[in-house]
Amino acid sequence: MALVKEVLEVLNRLSPFELQESWDNSGLNVGSGNSEFSQIIACLEITLQIALNAQENALIITHHPLIFKPLKTLNDEAYPGNILKILIQKNISVISMHTNFDKTHLNKHFARALLRFDGLIEKGLMLVKENANIEFDVLLEKIKLSLGVGQLACVKSSQMIKDLAFVCGSGASMFSSLKAQSCLITGDVKYHDAMIAQSLGISLIDATHYYSERGFALIVAEILHSFNYLVTIENFKNPLQII
């Protein structure tokens, strides 16, 4: 069997962990680089069910770090201790590819492959399309069609949108670097973000955290397949539902 550190080295070459934000926790979160693994699983998030279904000695590659904030206690009756207990008992290793992967792969997938926009400029965690000159209503319908959803929360501050900005995941706080008549497409838009953006003449479209990043597992699987690794993709439904 192959070693965890061999996969870690491949991932680091393609999406260097040093690119992650200072507050992030990408890299080997659980296990040892010298461990052998029985299978590779790629997922957006490690859920309790994914941990239960995984083989012993598996390697799970996830987008969101299971261990994100420093742990003061490890309570197996609370999150994330309930999942960590299973992983440790089954000798499962976990690699997280978070903000480093946003910069190198996932944001491009969100804006280009999923939403089908081109001519994009990289600005930190954002991808920007200048002089898009598109009507807000047309833009909103295009995004809903691309995501396959009927409704999206949004802030319509102007009918004509000059510049577009894309941030997969939770990027609503980044609108402060934009100008009036811009539109930021991201996830996790909060009430106060919406109020401030509206006052500045900036539009927002909440494509949701889930939909903007759900391509993660497939991208990782395709990358590792090119290095002759077999990867099982574990998908799950968005836990937030509109009823």
From Swiss-Prot:
GO molecular-function term, one example from the UniProt record: GTP cyclohydrolase I activity
Record bears the keyword GTP-binding: yes
Pathway(s) per entry: Cofactor biosynthesis; 7,8-dihydroneopterin triphosphate biosynthesis; 7,8-dihydroneopterin triphosphate from GTP: step 1/1
The protein's Enzyme Commission number: 3.5.4.16
Enzyme type, top EC level: hydrolase
Residues holding a divalent metal cation 2: 64, 209, 213
GO CC annotation terms, alphabetical: cytoplasm
Pfam family, one: DUF34_NIF3
Keyword terms of this UniProt record: GTP-binding, Hydrolase, Metal-binding, Nucleotide-binding
Catalysed reactions, semicolon-separated: GTP + H2O = 7,8-dihydroneopterin 3'-triphosphate + formate + H(+)
Binding site for a divalent metal cation 1: 63, 102, 213
Family according to the record: Belongs to the GTP cyclohydrolase I type 2/NIF3 family.
Quaternary state and interactors: Homohexamer.
Known role: Converts GTP to dihydroneopterin triphosphate.
Matching NCBIfam families: YbgI_SA1388
Protein's recorded name: GTP cyclohydrolase 1 type 2
Organism whose genome encodes this protein: Helicobacter pylori (strain J99 / ATCC 700824) (Campylobacter pylori J99)
